[in-house]
């Protein structure tokens, strides 16, 4: 339990008074102000605006006081300790990342089970699998005592001798990049600061790499200030960051950002230009010299930002891209770099009935990943685009990986389902042979459970898949404790994949369900766009329909059904809780976007406008105001139990979203069920979170839901 110091308590007493307790959890009353904003003639109160200042003593005292109330409640739950024990047992298994090869060396990550961060390993051969003859390339567990410093990216040089790597602290999106000599295990003097939303791309000679960064933020604004005007640089080893070569920027458009990759032959820099968190982007290329890079002017291929253009490879002077231009479910196109006008693009692989979600070029073949009703299929095509075969996956689930270069003979992939942890497989590109490389051994027995795919009809007649995992022999009597998860945004597909939260809930006697709803990419760009902007309500309708289906089919009932989602999924949970509080027993929005009128004012929030729109537009204001979780809490209506989670260092979705939502929810008359907020200290949006914090937070979530449903956990 968090202990408040005397000084913190003194400050808390000044800003938080213990008023009449509307609910049994003993909330403090959060100070209100008379802040009112007017949007297109509509006045909107924002009484907790002061909570947006995460650096103020008042906000820090509020955080401490809220955490104390929450932890007292959680500590008293009989389900807390057994849930944590089960979660720890199921989390404690050896896990492997997907291997990749560079310069005659293989690289992969491994975690013994309860290590705070995954460790990067390397070996020149994988004849003995992923354990023997491996050397530690980089162990981030040595970078901090509490495990809060994580690897944000690793990129070996072409010869496999050097490793560019990014580190991030306390869950922040800000990264610092360094370079390690893999022969000595020592870091070079090079240090790159203020990197965000970028990786590194080495030149073929290994003398330097490309990366993107922002200007240093103003003092006190690192976690909240808006991120604009990203710039693309080349860093030459042995030089100061201040001497890096500026490759690309756009002084006339503050939203431009850059992603890079160098072609397999080292002759071309391919630049993806993004303007938002959506999938639409532009493309530029820059020929690279044989000698030292000293700069150059990128040549545009397309800067219309009208579709997705994902580089796959450069083959025979042609740039191969995966694109949804004139193909909502995507196609593979070939661009002649000497004549790159769109009119001359050739289709190598036409759009099919399933959504193409990934493409790689390995061993002279194209490996194309598709989703068929939210489960992975992988098809193999020749250099001419002709379909050759299909990768024989183990079952209905999710496969990922398949990386490599055009002249590689092998590639690796992972396969997982709701009840099977990720296995690592090797795929021989020429023969199509698959060999198992690593299969985790866990305390979870998948043979005791089954997963089935069902289809739900939404409010407007749209058909959507859901996946239900449960113990074999499930009784359909409405009594099953059921946890429904969703996301529904940014073209991100929700597919069946193993996670310890689901496994723990199943082990506790529950049913776990994921819903593949609009806003995601399960059926292509049209499916995504049907859940954006003025159509965002479709996302909520889909999720509500999934919940109603579970009740009608007697999988669950309103007293045994809980919902959960994070980030955009936190918005989903918040909105649906407001719209159908009668349908759920518990709701857990994690790091959610709750203030839809001001989200664009913080860090990278402006980039979400492609999915949400902004309150600056009158029509969008009306739509946003109609569902914004913060602005639609209904006083006088009985709400389910709510546990809000966030991190005090979240610089993706700033914690003020959750702070203001929690304060508003606690102040409203929403019935006796608890309305709590759990604020993780020294943690961010989720990436890089240490194992101990993951176990504590997620087991608390499951214990909270179980407690609400009076589920006994042994």
Language model: regions and residue ranges:
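Hydrophobic beta-strand positions that form the internal "hydrophobic ladder"
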Residues: 106, 163, 209, 269, ...
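Polar, glycine-rich mid-to-C-terminal structural blocks
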Residues: 230, 234-274
